[in-house]
Curated annotation (Swiss-Prot):
Keywords: Ligase, Phosphopantetheine, Phosphoprotein, Transferase. Residues 941-1340 are annotated as: Condensation (C) domain. It is an enzyme of class 2 (transferase). This is D-lysergyl-peptide-synthetase subunit 2. Gene3D superfamilies: 3.30.300.30, 3.40.50.980, ACP-like (1.10.1200.10), Chloramphenicol acetyltransferase-like domain (3.30.559.10), Luciferase, Domain 3 (2.30.38.10), Nonribosomal peptide synthetase, condensation domain (3.30.559.30). The keyword Phosphoprotein applies. Pfam families: AMP-binding, Condensation, PP-binding. Residues 285-684 are annotated as: Adenylation (A) domain. The modification O-(pantetheine 4'-phosphoryl)serine is found at residue 865. PANTHER family: FATTY ACID SYNTHASE, NONRIBOSOMAL PEPTIDE SYNTHETASE. The gene is lpsB. It comes from Epichloe festucae var. lolii (Neotyphodium lolii). NRP synthetases are composed of discrete domains (adenylation (A), thiolation (T) or peptidyl carrier protein (PCP) and condensation (C) domains) which when grouped together are referred to as a single module. Each module is responsible for the recognition (via the A domain) and incorporation of a single amino acid into the growing peptide product. Thus, an NRP synthetase is generally composed of one or more modules and can terminate in a thioesterase domain (TE) or reductase domain (R) that releases the newly synthesized peptide from the enzyme. GO terms for cellular component: cytoplasm. One of its GO terms (biological process) is indole alkaloid biosynthetic process.
Length: 1351
């Protein structure tokens, strides 16, 4: 038998050889277990029009060869092993992976006629790995492969071992005697296997008695000759260092002499030092062009002479108030000409200014003022009240606030105070950015640093005396500072629009002010049309990632400039975009500084050209550091590393800034931006750039030659017609359809656009989606993947995206499901009750009725406790008795039909409660409530106790005003009737007391809920982000904002719902939105009182017996352990992980699976089988009539204990956890403070530091109004423990988000736990009848106690 083998790069047939060794496939399966794909990245910025094979020599000189021979004789490590390890090291630094693999082709020892064997070489590397151990492992693995020389890594074997068909794109060919220390002569040139077109890079090596030779073969479309030479030199350096260093991998320097020389040439000139101060440069302009316009604002104009006069007067006044060097002065202004006066006045006084955005929360502004130790603040009259709350001493500046223009207010004794002339090393300004802990982080920029950026910036942007610069950016961003000071230094005019113009009339403002230059984010630039801003000559884009359309839209209309910088180092690089072909991910050489690329884990090592590393900036342009944060400053603003001192001299002391950006040098020394170090790059808002999704899908989907992603509305969508992201994946076929029929979209060619679904394609979809979750936000991961035979084209030979949208939109549900794994036949329901339940199942699970069978398992088909409640509600409406526990006990449709009971259910309803009947002394309480709410007594509708959940949430907010407040943005259709919408919300608020609820404090009852008769609060604004919402005692907990920011239109385009978590949970919002829709369409609403649930909570027994029994003899330490008993966890790191969970065998709720999987994970990492943690429950299983319709939050936090028997079945453990959960339903609402008081063991259980929150998948909205593209889940607002785990269900995916305190749990530990959790969860689904012991290898320290406990 002959087996044809295809190499993994492009699938062309290569070799035929016998495959008769049984052990071969087993060997490869074992060897490749856990292996990740390793792809060498293309270093080309622009691919040439033609491609051909090429090669460069790798110099293995006589001295290195003699060292290799000596090393081999001494250690027994072959030359081939050293070559393999060296190439593994090269792959590591170019891919950033510690685990790498590549093709391994070795000519058998029989000579030139021997058959080549294609395999894989895996190399596990890390900085701490011992070199000798690495070499020994590689050699041992190679020996095992040589034992089965005729069994290659065929596609069949590879497909069994790896989910991805593209495992590697580089290969090494070893010929001659390099495989063993003893020599076997063979000639490199005689080995002609013809593999050049199979891999992007091939490294060929040959060893003879006389010496060794090597070469690197490549495709010119993949590498340039210079890049290939650099890689070859890096390989040579790796070979030399591997046999010369006896310690660890981290000690190897991969930078070749050639690369070092080139990098030093690019950065040979030290950045020039700046010797002037900003006020001096602006003063020169004021003297040389006094009548020229300096500021043209909506509230007035100032010439340079007027600006100089006003700022000088104000500066003298500030000096008398103590402003001088290193004194920071906050400025609090709306957009105004007076802001520029105040900025320049502080500079002239010798101080440093701090611009505040008054729209930001007062707490943040106060924090900034406290950080800078502000003694006084300069503010406009409009924001004087706010300023007084920030700093006690205020100087008002404005048209009617100019007492400082005369010297009358200056005390005689301070008249003699004069400021010291500023020095280049003095602080010029501080700009605050978000800190990792939520506290604003201040960056100090000195005069010298700013001056160093002046000439490079003004030259690149083209600023001069004719320039009119648009000051668009918020005062919170340093772009405003550049737009102001750079313009004044250049003699131009600063154009200041009003806030209204900024948000709703940008184009007209640009025209009205005759703006020539503007700095905008790409997002803002996208809303402008070049035809509407004809005065604009230069557009500077920065702050966000560019896409191709940003260039094509503007490059032929204006001078387009791409600015790359950071607050810590204002300008890193500036690139002029000269054409559509410009690489917008690449920036030009450094501007006013030098750019170096270092090892991300060690800034004392430079990396070779083309490898990915961290960008560090050298030069005066670098800021001073972070205000009052020496630790962070020393980690980011570092002393010159040794390699820099070698270039500049030992006494060199220039500042060096570690940017945290991952970049690589291109062949000409420019920089290509890759991403952020150790973080994921975020998109601004939730805009989906289809090109970005296409890029990632193409990288991820095996053998995809092209990808098109479109937003499609399918014909089977519910009434909401919600669109879904569809990825069209081009797959290769022998014959393409007729291009003309496909171009026009007519004829038989249309049916040939989509390929038939195959098992291989369908099985890859969940794997690809899981991989995409690692690089894209969840909303950017396509939900549907369709294979294409060819790309349809328009008459102009462009991709016919419209045709693809129509094609996907026309597919039926059955056709779409054919691209998913097939399911078995359905047994139709027989009895009347079974048919009724079939209807219920279909409605709550959103699946066609005909696809629901009598044997269907409710939880297997996607049900959970939330959908179970909806099913119960449907049964009640049809006068059938059914409980959630019935569904848990009998989840199969046929079995559930046997327990459904007919009869009236409404008779069991408790009588309605009278207002105020749940509190004593209600008259006194009503008066106190009215006083705290600052409302008349007559509007107090009811008062009743808070739930334990509400008490806890409000208490946290009283300590931190931002805690547990959600901002949910809802897009509105253009034809919305505003009056009807507001009336609808009023109707909903009248029907739902929870929306009219406030919280008050009572001496006798503690925290109480007060329902008031009032309309819901509305605000109309131009800026959703500018709205503050403060929650406190007696304050409303709900506020609605209509945001009108559509260009040229005052119609609101977005509704912002600001709401406290004490009045909603994840279940209530869809209910409220459904009511709004019904009211908008003229429907009537039934009241949704919260009192029945409050009465139930008040009547719950204390639970002493239940909780003490559940937690009896609990002695397990808290996990994770805190540094000290008094330590307060502060979640400050986030990590995400997506797990594909098969639907089969899911006989229990997702919550049950999650609890057990986490219990096993925690047991593994804690070393005990008695586990406890916290969990959030929905509370909707409570026996309260119509609880599924109530809009009061019912979630609760409870402790959960799991005692693992590692000899028991997974099924048994799942059943035990689910039974415990059901039996605990009556005691869920007691609250942690109450449970904690029940006893010593209960107190320990409530001291958990790990909290699990499982959110079931909610059904899609029923109306397009209520899509929420602007809303985000703020996990930080709800996290107070050392480990907070949030789980979201989306089909067969479980999305885990861990928010944790990295001072308690290190990043690698958290990552390890999430990976273990995912593996355990998947195994539980796949093998529910396996032993818990078999799910995960039990640590050695656990085996003793676990065995004894189990036996």
């Amino acid at each position: 038998m002959q087996s044809q083998v295809r190499l993994p790069s492009n699938g062309n047939p290569a070799l035929s050889f016998p495959q008769n060794e049984i052990g071969g496939p087993v060997h490869w399966k074992t060897y490749l277990e856990g292996c990740s794909p390793c792809s060498f990245p293309s270093l080309r910025t622009v691919c040439p029009s033609q491609s051909w094979p090429a090669s460069v020599s790798i110099t293995i000189g006589d001295s290195i060869f003699r060292r290799l021979e000596h090393f081999s004789d001494k250690t027994g490590i072959s030359v081939a092993t050293v070559f393999r390890a060296s190439w593994g090291l090269v792959l590591r630094i170019y891919t950033g992976q510690d685990s790498v693999c590549f093709g391994d082709m070795t000519t058998a020892p029989g000579g030139i006629d021997a058959i080549g064997c294609v395999g894989v070489c895996r190399v596990e590397l890390s900085d701490t790995a011992v070199i000798s151990k690495v070499l020994q492992r590689i050699q041992a693995a190679s020996a095992n492969k040589l034992a089965i020389p005729h069994v290659p890594l065929s596609d069949a074997v590879l497909s069994k071992c790896m989910p991805s068909a593209s495992l590697f794109n580089t290969c090494m060919l070893i010929s001659g005697g390099g495989e063993r220390p003893e020599k076997t002569s063979s000639t490199f040139e005689k080995v002609e296997l013809g593999y050049d077109d199979q891999y992007d890079i091939i490294v060929r090596g040959s060893v003879e008695d006389s010496g060794a030779s090597a070469a690197l073969s490549y495709r010119t479309s993949f590498l340039s000759e210079e890049q290939a030479t650099s890689i070859a030199n890096t390989f040579e350096r790796a070979v030399s260092d591997l046999i010369g260093i006896e310690n660890r991998i981290g000690q190897i320097c991969f930078l070749s002499d050639l690369d070092k020389s080139q990098i030093y040439t690019w950065n040979k000139d030290p950045p020039l030092r700046a010797h002037s101060c900003v006020d001096t440069l602006i003063h020169e302009r004021c003297l040389s062009q006094p009548t020229a316009s300096a500021v043209n604002a909506w509230d007035g104009e100032l010439s340079y002479e007027e600006l100089n006069h006003l700022s000088s007067k104000l500066s003298r006044h500030l000096v008398t108030l103590g402003v001088g060097a290193e004194v920071f002065v906050p400025l609090c202004f709306e957009k105004s000409r007076w802001t520029t006066v105040a900025m320049l006045a502080v500079i002239k006084a010798g101080g440093a200014f701090v611009l505040l955005d008054p729209s930001h929360p007062a707490e943040r502004l106060l924090s900034i003022c406290q950080k800078v130790s502000a003694r006084l603040i300069v503010a406009s009259a409009q924001h004087a009240k706010l300023a007084e709350d920030l700093v006690t001493s205020i100087v008002e500046v404005g048209d009617d606030k100019a007492d400082w223009l005369t010297d009358k207010g200056i005390k005689a004794q301070t008249q003699t105070r004069t400021r010291r002339s500023a020095a280049p090393g003095d602080a010029l300004y501080a700009v605050f950015t978000s800190g990792s802990t939520g506290t604003p982080k201040g960056v100090i920029i000195e005069h010298g640093s700013f001056h160093a950026a002046v000439f490079p910036y003004t030259e690149a942007v083209g600023l001069n005396q004719e320039s009119r610069v648009f000051q668009f950016s918020s005062y919170a961003f340093d772009v405003t500072i550049f737009d102001t000071l750079m313009t004044l230094i250049s003699g131009g005019c600063v154009c200041v629009p009003s806030n209204t113009e900024r948000w709703s009339d940008v184009a007209n403002a640009i025209q009205r002010f005759r703006v020539t230059h503007s700095s905008l984010t790409p997002t803002v630039a996208r809303i402008l049309d070049p035809k509407d801003v004809l005065t604009l000559r230069t557009l500077v884009l920065g702050g966000e990632k560019l896409v191709t359309s940003d260039i094509t839209k503007w490059v032929d209309q204006v001078r387009l400039v791409h600015l790359y910088g950071a607050s810590e180092c204002p300008i890193m690089s500036i690139q002029s975009m000269t054409g559509v072909a410009s690489d917008f991910q690449t920036t030009d050489h450094a501007t006013g500084s030098n750019c170096w690329i270092v090892d991300p884990n060690n800034h004392d090592r430079l990396v070779p050209i083309g490898t990915i590393g961290e960008l560090v900036i050298e030069g005066t342009i670098v800021g001073r550091g972070y205000l009052d944060d020496p630790e962070k400053s020393s980690a980011t603003f570092i002393r010159p590393p040794g390699w820099l001192c070698q270039v500049r001299g030992s006494g060199y002391h220039s500042a060096v800034y570690k940017s945290g950006d991952l970049v690589q040098y291109t062949a000409d020394g420019s920089l290509r931006y890759i991403g952020r170090k150790d973080t994921q790059v975020k998109l601004r808002g939730q805009r989906v750039e289809l090109g970005e999704v296409e890029h990632h899908v193409k990288l991820t989907f095996p053998n995809a030659t092209d990808v098109v992603v479109e937003l499609v509305v399918t014909i089977h969508a519910s009434s909401s017609r919600a669109p879904i992201l569809v990825a069209f994946v081009l797959i290769s076929h022998e014959a393409d359809p007729d291009p003309e029929s496909i171009r026009t979209g007519r004829g038989e060619g249309l049916s040939q656009i989509l390929s038939e679904p195959t098992d291989r394609f369908c099985s890859q979809i969940p794997i690809v989606q899981s991989q995409l979750q690692q690089s894209l936000p969840s909303y950017m991961v396509p939900g549907i993947f369709l294979p294409l035979m060819t790309l349809p084209l328009t008459s102009t030979d462009k991709i016919n995206r419209k045709l693809l949208r129509e094609l996907a939109g026309a597919l039926s549900r059955e056709e779409l499901e054919s691209y998913q794994p097939s399911t078995g036949p359905v047994r139709a329901p027989q009895t009347t009750t079974e048919k009724l339940l079939q209807q219920y199942f279909a409605r709550v699970l959103n699946i066609p009725v005909e696809q629901v069978g009598a044997d269907d398992h409710f939880f297997q088909r996607g049900g959970d406790s939330l959908t179970a409640m909806k099913l119960v509600a449907m049964a009640r409406k049809d006068k059938h008795k059914l409980t959630v526990q019935d569904i848990f006990d009998s989840p199969r449709l046929s079995a559930l039909a046997c327990v459904v009971r007919s009869g009236k259910v409404d008779g069991n309803k408790e009588p309605p409660l009278e207002p105020f009947s749940l509190v004593n002394k209600h008259r006194d309480i009503i008066r106190a409530a009215a006083q705290q709410c600052q409302l008349p007594v007559r509007v107090i509708e009811d008062v009743y106790p808070c739930t334990p959940l509400q008490r806890g949430l409000i208490s946290e907010t009283l300590r931190d005003s931002k805690a547990f407040i959600a901002h949910l943005a809802v897009s509105l259709p253009p034809d919305i009737d505003l009056q009807r919408l507001q009336e609808a919300w009023t109707t909903v608020a009248n029907a739902n007391p929870i929306l009219r609820t406030r919280m008050v404090l009572s001496a006798s009852h503690g925290l109480l809920q007060v329902v008031v008769r009032e309309d819901i609060r509305w605000i109309v604004s131009k800026n959703a982000e500018a709205q503050d919402f403060f929650v406190g005692v007696g304050k409303p907990l709900v506020q609605l904002v209509l945001c009108c920011h559509r260009e040229g239109n005052e119609v609101p385009v977005q509704l912002l719902l600001m709401v406290h978590h004490a009045v909603y949970d994840g279940y209530t919002l869809p209910l409220i939105f459904e009511q709004v829709k019904a009211a908008y369409n003229g429907g009537t609403l039934a009241p949704r009182p919260a009192v029945p649930f409050i009465r139930y909570v008040q009547s719950i027994p204390d639970g002493t017996g239940y909780w003490n029994s559940l937690m009896a003899n609990l002695q397990t330490p808290i996990f994770p352990a805190l540094p000290s008993k008094s330590y307060q966890p502060l979640p400050n790191a986030i990590m995400r992980h997506t797990i594909i969970t098969p639907g089969s065998h899911r006989q229990y709720t997702p919550s049950t699976y999650v609890r057990l999987a986490w219990a096993i994970t925690q047991a593994y990492h804690q070393g005990t089988c008695d586990i406890f943690f916290g969990t959030v429950v929905s509370g909707r299983n409570a026996p309260v009539t119509d609880i599924e319709l109530m809009t009061i939050p019912t979630v609760a936090t409870i402790p959960c204990r799991v005692t693992l028997d590692f000899q028991s079945l997974v099924q048994s453990a799942l059943r035990k956890i689910q039974d415990d959960a059901i039996s605990g339903i009556p005691f869920e609402q007691l609250g942690l403070p109450h449970i904690r008081r029940l006893g010593e063991h209960a107190m320990l259980a409530c001291s958990f530091q790990t909290l699990l929150s499982i959110q079931p998948a909610l059904p899609p909205s029923t109306d397009a109004w209520f899509e929420q593209p602007g809303s985000t889940i703020d996990y930080r607002a709800n996290a107070t423990y050392a480990i907070n785990l949030f789980f979201g269900l989306e089909g067969d995916k479980l999305k885990a988000t861990a928010l944790y305190d990295f001072n308690v749990v290190k990043k690698d530990k958290m990552q390890s736990m999430l990976v273990d959790f995912g593996n355990i969860l998947q195994t539980m689904h796949k093998s529910p009848n396996s032993l818990i012991r078999d799910i995960l290898a039990v640590p050695q320290q656990m085996r003793g106690p676990i065995n004894s406990a189990s036996l």
